[in-house]
């Protein structure tokens, strides 16, 4: 199978390219929970890209940058693959708008650019694109690079879910998303001893709607706002257990916003598969 699609053949690409589903599905495990948005003005190329990615992801399409911008906001896909040269709004302009808007700044964007157009590559990186693929491109490489970005995001989410939070400043997110996570962490920590701190208060302090707060935290950390709050409470509790061997378990529970010690112990064991007392003994002996 000829795996390259050239920019000069865009108008008749379907005539020159036959998609073999088995090759793609063998490369990447299908996951229909992943939404991918393809933004491409050429109908033939849009059809080919759809046929490639629909084998592994849930695919949506847009015919230009303006439509892509609107669909990205409503769909909240896990990935956008976009051509650069399009009518109404270019892929570069769309990418810049996506990456500068808190509602969509977390969505990875891969741009397709013509070969030997280094200015497009530079502009794409400057507008915040996560990757770029030059035409003519190898379909297997396109699929692999898109999948790598998606899997990297999933691995980061799993670290948060496992209460193994990485340092925000070390995360491969853009400045808007890093600031959002740092602000969210600071707000939760400021209410850390308050058992009545809830998602409504969290959203108000973040100056966000509850829906946007949920969308952002879920996309960046894999956690709901309630899970994010709980994980930070537990993380602070583990630090206290390690650093203060004389602190009572009940006092630690109340200090970090748990309404009663029993609830704290249950949450701690669910998260770390060990009780707070056993956790303290483990680190005291290490």
Label the predicted regions.
Residues 219-259, 282-286:
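Terminal helix-turn-helix DNA-binding modules in bacterial transcription factors
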Residues 137-146, 150:
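C-terminal output helix
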Residues 47-52:
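Charged docking surfaces used in two-component/phosphorelay signaling
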């Amino acid at each position: 199978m000829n795996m390259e699609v050239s920019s000069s053949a865009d108008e008749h690409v379907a005539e020159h390219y036959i998609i073999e589903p088995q090759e793609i599905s063998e490369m990447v495990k299908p996951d229909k929970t992943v939404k991918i948005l393809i933004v491409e003005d050429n109908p033939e190329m849009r059809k080919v890209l759809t046929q490639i990615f629909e084998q592994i992801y849930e695919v949506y399409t847009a015919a230009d940058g303006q439509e892509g911008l609107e669909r990205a906001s409503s769909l909240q896909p896990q990935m956008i693959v976009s051509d650069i040269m399009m009518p109404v709004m270019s892929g570069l302009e769309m990418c810049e708008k996506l990456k500068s808007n808190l509602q969509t700044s977390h969505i990875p964007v891969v741009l397709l650019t013509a070969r030997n157009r280094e200015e497009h590559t530079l502009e794409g990186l400057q507008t915040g694109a996560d990757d770029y693929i030059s035409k003519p491109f190898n379909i297997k490489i396109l699929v692999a690079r898109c999948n790598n970005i998606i899997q990297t995001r999933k691995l980061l989410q799993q670290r948060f879910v496992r209460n193994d939070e990485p340092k925000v400043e070390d995360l491969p997110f853009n400045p808007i998303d890093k600031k959002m996570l740092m602000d969210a962490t600071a707000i939760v920590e400021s209410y850390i001893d308050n058992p009545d701190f809830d998602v409504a208060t969290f959203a108000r302090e973040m100056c966000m709607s509850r829906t946007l707060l949920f969308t952002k935290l879920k996309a960046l950390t894999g956690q709901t706002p309630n899970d994010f709050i709980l994980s930070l409470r537990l993380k602070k509790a583990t630090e206290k257990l390690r650093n203060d061997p004389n602190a009572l378990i009940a006092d630690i529970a109340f200090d970090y916003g748990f309404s009663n010690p029993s609830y704290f112990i249950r949450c701690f064991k669910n998260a770390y598969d060990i009780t707070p007392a056993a956790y303290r003994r483990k680190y005291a002996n290490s």
